[in-house]
């Protein structure tokens, strides 16, 4: 029996183009000026200190830190410091109405149905927890954060590491075999499966021929009571 569902965001609940064509450019355009202006104020000061640790450069100047952040963006590196700064910048965009969090139309009805069935819902994304809450708090469908029991980001571990899913199961307090993980990336599903999770792969485009996970194209194809082994 599935007692908890953990879902990815990018390519799963939300179109990858929203993240890459709207969110990422918005943050990139504002990052240098924002970091420079806020470098001595919290929480940016602490985030930059963490970034210095991340790049092993304890005396890095603000210019060097900005350069590192742009390199991380170019590489699409899952840097916790970068994700935290992006989340802060995106907050202004959401609050100002510059954009709303995009959801596939099949997502909300399924989440509401599963919640009504007594299944706890969680999010696990490489984006910061703050950014996750913003996307669902300012979504196309309004604020749907009440549907989720918790959020996880790279602080729990990388998404392709087995230990990350073991950590999530421990924090949720549910046996891995009773947790369903939804993602569009089969390497993430591989790690979750090795941790004992049940898995389903969301295919929003072409089928993934390299994956052995059961594939669905929409959330309304998912029945938590009938998850293929």
Swiss-Prot record:
Which reaction equations make up its catalytic activity? 5-methylsulfanyl-2,3-dioxopentyl phosphate + H2O = 1,2-dihydroxy-5-(methylsulfanyl)pent-1-en-3-one + phosphate
Molecular function terms in GO for this entry?
Answer: 2,3-diketo-5-methylthiopentyl-1-phosphate enolase activity; 2-hydroxy-3-keto-5-methylthiopentenyl-1-phosphate phosphatase activity; acireductone synthase activity; magnesium ion binding
Question: What does the record say about how the cofactor binds?
Answer: Binds 1 Mg(2+) ion per subunit.
Q: Which GO terms describe its biological process?
A: L-methionine salvage from methylthioadenosine
Alphabetized InterPro entries for the sequence: Enolase-ppase_E1, HAD-like_sf, HAD-SF_hydro_IA, HAD_sf
Record's SUPFAM superfamilies?
HAD-like
EC top class named in words: hydrolase
Under Pfam families, the record lists: Hydrolase
Keywords of this entry: Amino-acid biosynthesis, Hydrolase, Magnesium, Metal-binding, Methionine biosynthesis
Q: Pathway it belongs to? A: Amino-acid biosynthesis; L-methionine biosynthesis via salvage pathway; L-methionine from S-methyl-5-thio-alpha-D-ribose 1-phosphate: step 3/6; Amino-acid biosynthesis; L-methionine biosynthesis via salvage pathway; L-methionine from S-methyl-5-thio-alpha-D-ribose 1-phosphate: step 4/6
Write down the EC number. Answer: 3.1.3.77
Enumerate the cofactors the protein uses: Mg(2+)
Q: Which top-rank group of organisms is this from?
A: Bacteria
Q: How does it assemble?
A: Monomer.
Any idea what job this protein has?
Bifunctional enzyme that catalyzes the enolization of 2,3-diketo-5-methylthiopentyl-1-phosphate (DK-MTP-1-P) into the intermediate 2-hydroxy-3-keto-5-methylthiopentenyl-1-phosphate (HK-MTPenyl-1-P), which is then dephosphorylated to form the acireductone 1,2-dihydroxy-3-keto-5-methylthiopentene (DHK-MTPene).
Q: Which family does it belong to?
A: Belongs to the HAD-like hydrolase superfamily. MasA/MtnC family.
Protein name per Swiss-Prot or TrEMBL = Enolase-phosphatase E1
Q: Which organism is it from?
A: Enterobacter sp. (strain 638)
Q: Which gene encodes it?
A: mtnC
């Amino acid at each position: 029996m599935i007692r908890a569902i953990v879902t990815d965001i990018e390519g799963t609940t939300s179109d990858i183009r929203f993240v890459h064509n709207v969110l990422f450019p918005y943050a990139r355009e504002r990052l240098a000026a924002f970091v420079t202006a806020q470098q001595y104020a919290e929480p940016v000061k602490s985030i930059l200190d963490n970034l210095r640790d991340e790049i092993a450069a304890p005396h890095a100047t603000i210019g060097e830190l900005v350069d590192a952040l742009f390199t991380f963006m170019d590489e699409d590196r899952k840097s916790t410091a970068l994700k935290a700064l992006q989340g802060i910048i995106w907050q202004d965009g959401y609050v100002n109405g510059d954009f709303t969090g995009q959801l596939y139309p099949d997502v909300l009805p399924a989440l509401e149905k599963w919640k009504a069935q007594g299944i706890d819902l969680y999010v696990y994304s490489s984006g910061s927890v703050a950014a996750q809450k913003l996307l669902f708090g300012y979504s196309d469908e309004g604020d749907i954060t009440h549907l989720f029991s918790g959020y996880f980001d790279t602080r729990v571990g990388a998404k392709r590491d087995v230990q990350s899913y073991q950590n999530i199961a421990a924090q949720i307090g549910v046996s891995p075999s009773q947790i369903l993980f939804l993602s569009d990336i089969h390497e993430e599903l591989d790690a979750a499966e090795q941790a004992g999770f049940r898995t389903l792969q969301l295919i929003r485009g072409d089928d993934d021929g390299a994956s052995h996970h059961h594939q669905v194209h929409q959330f309304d194809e998912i029945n938590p009571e009938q998850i293929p082994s």
